[in-house]
Design a protein with these regions (language model features):
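Secretory targeting signals
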Residues: 1-9, 33-102, 135-139, 154
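Helix-to-coil boundary motifs at intracellular loop junctions of multi-pass secondary transporters
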Residues: 14, 93-97, 173
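Bimodal feature
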Residues: 17, 21, 49-51, 108-112, ...
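Terminal transmembrane helical anchor/hairpin motif
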Residues: 101-179
């Protein structure tokens, strides 16, 4: 959720500083939205890589002889790595539809609350925290990680489509989504 808040703060920066008209005159709002998305996704990838490398020695030491680098990498990439783009796409789409920080924050918080409470028991709907209770060192984790990956990729495609739809609704010259 930190990256969702970071996305909303970055999107609201030009209107909060009252330089939105100047930025829109210098760079097309469509180009700015795409560049913002790429920058945030790049930051998320860098954060994931640094987190993965930072926790690697501690995890290998704590788990001991049963440590498997493949399971470690897959677990981080699926469980944490795909959550970052989901938050960025959701917050970016909410911002592009509403163009208001407070409404976008409420939308993201509502979907996060649904994922953590009501949708918790449905593995396909809990986008924020997948239904993975434990990973095994005796049996294969492939089925658990595969179902979590399917769930994450389904949400990733859905939120990418929602972001693309919101990209088409970027307001230019204050005319609104239909202008």
């Amino acid at each position: 959720l930190f990256f969702a808040l970071l996305t909303l703060c970055d999107c609201a920066r030009t209107s909060r500083c009252r330089v939105e008209v100047l930025c829109d005159a210098a760079v097309s709002p469509l180009t700015a939205a795409l560049a913002r998305l790429m920058a945030l996704l790049g930051t998320a990838a860098l954060t994931l890589a640094l987190t993965l490398l930072t926790w690697l020695p501690w995890t290998a030491h704590t788990v001991g002889a049963v440590f498997d680098g493949g399971d470690y990498l897959l677990a981080y990439l699926i469980l944490m790595g795909l959550a970052l783009p989901l938050c960025i796409l959701l917050a970016g789409a909410a911002w592009q539809f509403t163009r208001r920080f407070d409404l976008s924050l409420v939308l993201v918080a509502a979907l996060a609350a649904l994922s953590l409470t009501i949708w918790r028991d449905n593995w396909q709907l809990c986008w924020l925290n997948p239904c993975v209770w434990a990973l095994s060192d005796d049996f294969s984790n492939f089925r658990i990680l595969r179902s979590a990956a399917y769930m994450r990729l389904t949400w990733l495609l859905g939120l990418a489509g929602l972001w693309a739809l919101s990209y088409l609704c970027i307001r230019r010259y204050g005319r609104g989504p239909l202008g």
